[in-house]
Amino acid sequence: MVFVDSHSHINSREFSGDLPAVLERMRSAGVAAATVIGCERGEQNRVIELVRESGSPRLFGAWALHPEYEDVAETSVEEIESICSAPEIAAVGETGLDYHWCKGDLSWQKNRFRMHLTAARSLGKPVIVHAREAEADAVKILAEQKAGDMGFVMHCYGGDLDTALACIDAGGMVSFTGTITFKNAGALREVVRALPLESLMIETDCPYMAPVPHRGKRNEPAYVVKVAEQIAAIKELSLDEVARVTTDNYKRFIKKEF
């Protein structure tokens, strides 16, 4: 079986001391590839370095100025295009809306989101969307901007079923983390149950969101298998089918083979 971690932050300092061991555990678990996300200016350099060094497992890069970061110089379509045109950067993201950490007039956040979508369209690259307590508004913008043309995924999905279906209708996919293994995530598991497997991806969002039985510890790409196991249990499917379909979905999204 082959798995993919569609969203990781193994470029973060939490992995600075043992990244080779993390990659070896990833390989041993059957996780053949991962997306490495850069969220700040300059972070793309480490992402590009990791992608260039990767063999097995394969790493693919993504970059965007994260929607939580208000107190930084605003980006531009030109800056996003310049950074994300690198061949090591396979996707634009994570970008989107965050109503959990950011309050007040968030027009700047929506404008930033639209700039990333414009750049992604120009580059012909897919978009990784961060939407926290803002899923419905994010999907509205994605639909308005016809982001399905480039392909997009709502990462670390935590919204309701109607919004997830609207995301799929707009041409996107929905990705789930280890949160679906949490005891209090019954409503989210029902969303997983109702969605077609052909529209799902799996991720760790490591070092955050470690699944049960690792909850409270540092997350890592090998643990994406626990997410796949939970989806298989929820949907009463074999783990092999969940692995195969979610990996195919990722390849279609990222427009890469491995």
Describe the residue ranges of each PLM region.
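Mid-domain alpha/beta scaffold segments of enzyme catalytic cores
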Residues: 1-258
